């Protein structure tokens, strides 16, 4: 529902009307948010119809919308890679393609272990389908013994499927071998790739190779490491 409000605000601020179509999971919330925004717009002297909401969970509505040449100026798909590519492939109206999120969390050797576990758990489990959910966890080798055993148990208790390199597999018999394709995959689900790295430089190189420039995270108590990560990683 926050995307409904964000999208409407951005469109109005840029001088555009907007047609909103949200997912079925948040249909009622989206409908309410859109109605409130339309009412507020009208109160500010903007036509209420400048903000419209498609009140159906039928996917055919999306197919109809992306073929309304002459009526719809541009479509902006927001969501997982599957939705985005389906719109890009099938639309006859112009599309602004949003990026997929292969997002990483790097647990540095100087991280607070308890904090790192909370962050790494939330980043994967809270909302695994969103584009800024973590897809790969990178762990410095010097903190792996303190961090990984408990972290893997936490993931297992929440039915997270773990794919890891050989070093990670030594910590649990429930870790599946990771593939080259896994590193660049946006799972959008309770599945996670895990890698142990020798240094922050290796972590940043991995992110540069497989990341999509979306959302990246470092967990550390080392100010210099945090600054290096912040100013190096896209």
Where are the language model's segments positioned?
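Conserved C-terminal structural/oligomerization subdomain of aldehyde/semialdehyde dehydrogenase
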Residues: 179-234
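A structured beta-alpha segment of the ubiquitous adenosine-cofactor-binding alpha/beta core
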Residues: 52-69
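Short hydrophobic alpha-helical runs that function as membrane-insertion/retention elements
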Residues: 17-21, 76, 96-97, 216-219
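ALDH superfamily catalytic-core signature
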Residues: 5-6, 10-17, 32, 43, ...
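A glycine-rich phosphate/pyrophosphate-binding beta-strand-loop-alpha-helix module
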Residues: 2-53
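Short acidic active-site motifs
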Residues: 60-64, 83, 199-202, 225
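Active-site/ligand-binding-proximal alpha/beta "capping" segment
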Residues: 65-74, 89
């Amino acid at each position: 529902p926050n995307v409904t409000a964000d999208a409407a605000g951005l469109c109005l601020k840029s001088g555009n009307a907007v047609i909103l179509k949200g997912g079925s999971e948040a249909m009622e919330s989206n409908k309410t948010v859109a109605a409130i925004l339309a009412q507020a717009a009208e109160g500010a002297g903007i036509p209420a119809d400048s903000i419209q909401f498609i009140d159906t969970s039928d996917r055919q509505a999306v197919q109809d919308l992306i073929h309304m040449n002459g009526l719809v100026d541009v479509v902006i798909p927001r969501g997982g890679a599957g939705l985005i590519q389906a719109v890009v492939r099938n639309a006859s109206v112009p599309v602004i393609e949003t990026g997929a999120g292969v997002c990483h969390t790097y647990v540095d050797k100087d991280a607070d272990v308890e904090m790192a576990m909370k962050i790494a758990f939330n980043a994967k489990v809270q909302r695994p389908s969103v584009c800024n959910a973590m897809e790969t966890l990178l762990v410095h080798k010097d903190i792996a013994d303190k961090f990984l055993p408990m972290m893997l148990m936490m993931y297992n208790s929440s039915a997270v499927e773990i794919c890891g390199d050989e070093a990670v597999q030594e910590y649990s018999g429930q870790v599946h071998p990771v593939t080259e394709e896994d590193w660049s995959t946006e799972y959008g689900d309770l599945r996670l790739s895990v890698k142990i790295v020798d240094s922050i430089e290796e972590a940043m190189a991995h992110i540069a190779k497989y990341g999509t420039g979306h959302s990246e995270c470092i967990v550390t108590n080392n100010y210099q490491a945090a600054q290096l990560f912040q100013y190096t990683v896209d």
